[in-house]
Amino acid sequence: MALRIFIWIVMILSAVGSVVLLALGNPLWKWGAAIIALCFGVAGVGKALYLKLDTLRGRFHLILSIGALIFCAAIVVGMVSTTPWQIFGLHYLARFIFIVSVALMFVGLMKQGYTLSARDWVVALLLFAALTAIGLWFFYTLYAGATTLMSILVYMSLFIMLEVLAVVQVYLGSSLGVRWTAGALSVMCVTVGDMSMAYFAVSSLPIWETVQYLSWSVLGFIMGVICLLWD
């Protein structure tokens, strides 16, 4: 309980402090995204241990938290390094772990007897297609010179969205369905952040850097809150 309260306090202070520093024009505001991602990772480990590692949800949160901690490292490296393979390598690894965690969760649910009807699949695929079409239109319209490195990152984020939408359909109507819907929103945030990183790289417009780190902060905050809800 004490750890959860501490994480709550750190996340809230980091979010508020980051916004205040941004308003003051202090570049240190970007570190808020890294701190919140760290809180997300630590909260995920705590929830995994609470749920027990021999349960499906426990294993899911453990793998998810590892991805969160690597995502935190990717944000930090992105602020202190300009070496592409270091930055993208960590971002790719974090996204890959996110993909694996959700995939294992989905497969585990299927093994436990949960099923998706043809209608559920159609709904998930239609939502995914609509969101992907909108996202890629904005991505390639604003970032006409999309590099392979950035394109891969965006596609990985979109694939996570497809997985999450499928799990949302499984849990729809339950309290976990609400949380997975919030998780889908957080995946949209990370995708927006990834796209904004590309826009900033090619345009150097400060607005895109702001959107990038704010989007990643929202991702970390939403997922951190979900991981702090123990049940």
What is each of the regions a protein language model found here?
Residues M1-D231:
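Polytopic alpha-helical membrane-helix bundles and their juxtamembrane interface segments
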